[in-house]
């Protein structure tokens, strides 16, 4: 986290006093990026005024502007960028009025945002994390060795402040750029679906899979290095415990831990949000396909009717005999019950009536165990009962038995914590696990 030595009112007064302002229309921004691209090809990082005019000429051609006033407009743009502190101008008496221009840190930062930083590279992120791990390893070892104030400032505080913190800021910037890239991909997908969703399905799938893969790769890289980085930060923090003169180091370590937690949590949150968006797009495509089937059929039918005289067609349908209603109308008016005889296996019995009868019978039979204080072995009793009923009723009878048995009492063995043995209760593989009820 950055530490400002000035207060907000002081910064406001400073910006007003120095007349800070940045105005970059599309043309000027393109000119600045052209300068950065050409400047990257030079070893000295310097450009002459003539080279800047040539770069502006390319920009003017790209914007289809007139070529008659290129030199004047180029000089105005150069002077404006110098005033806004995007370019530094160096003049010399020996150069006879020819100036040399270099990009300022502000100009480099703006062009990096639009050119270099937008190119996400997992290899670059891996190298940054590797450098951070090495710096933290050395700082942790130096912290555990201990030393005077100069030792802590040179070997612990300085690497954390000027190397680790800056790389964390760079990773944070990469993640913020990934956020913008996701928004850009969403806009591209929306534009494709609005044009022709059938032709856009493949392109949408490619954009979704590429972004998902990039986010997953980023998160895997961060998680692989995150634990090791946190461990080294904890080593440094433990070494500062009990030393009041190391509050600055302890605060810096805490800030780095918070920043690392935020970086790692961002990765997982971004993946979760993207998965939700991915599902939303696929759901939209599936809905569009389902709706399109009916729409296409209706459209084809309408066109066929409209162009019948140009392209006659025939309609084929099944010609089956009519189904006559042979029911007796008087039979429907009769309200008396239809009587008849059915085999015993087909007779219908209401389940509630059967359950009430079984419950009463089982309750009366089990009551003997409570009155005479006889231990109730639920497995044996259940096996005897189930033998009296068909297999289809075993589950219902067993459930009623268990409900009535637990109302009578409890088993002292339940308090021992030992599991009961499994006992077979029928010949079809059913088993029950219950202690003997001996306390009513």
UniProtKB/Swiss-Prot annotation:
Q: Which InterPro entries match?
A: Chromosome_partition_MukF, MukF_C, MukF_C_sf, MukF_M, MukF_M_sp, MukF_WHTH, TonB_box_CS, WH-like_DNA-bd_sf
Q: Does the keyword Glycosyltransferase apply?
A: no
One GO term in the molecular function aspect is: calcium ion binding
Q: Provide an example Pfam family for this protein.
A: KicB
Question: Any idea which UniProt keywords this protein has?
Answer: Calcium, Cell cycle, Cell division, Chromosome partition, Cytoplasm, DNA condensation
Q: Where is the protein situated, by its record's location annotation?
A: Cytoplasm, Nucleoid
Q: Is Metal-binding one of the keywords UniProt gives this record? A: no
Which CDD domains does the UniProt record give? MukF_C, MukF_N
Where primarily located? Answer: cytoplasm
Q: Which residue ranges does UniProt annotate as crossing the membrane?
A: none
Q: Positions of the region Leucine-zipper?
A: 208-236
Q: Which GO terms describe its biological process?
A: cell division; chromosome condensation; chromosome segregation; DNA replication
A single GO CC term for this protein reads: cytoplasm
According to its UniProt entry, the function of this protein is described as:
Involved in chromosome condensation, segregation and cell cycle progression. May participate in facilitating chromosome segregation by condensation DNA from both sides of a centrally located replisome during cell division. Not required for mini-F plasmid partitioning. Probably acts via its interaction with MukB and MukE. Overexpression results in anucleate cells. It has a calcium binding activity.
The entry's family comment says: Belongs to the MukF family.
How does this polypeptide assemble, per the annotation? Interacts, and probably forms a ternary complex, with MukE and MukB via its C-terminal region. The complex formation is stimulated by calcium or magnesium. It is required for an interaction between MukE and MukB.
Q: What is this protein called?
A: Chromosome partition protein MukF
Specify the taxonomic lineage. Bacteria, Pseudomonadati, Pseudomonadota, Gammaproteobacteria, Enterobacterales
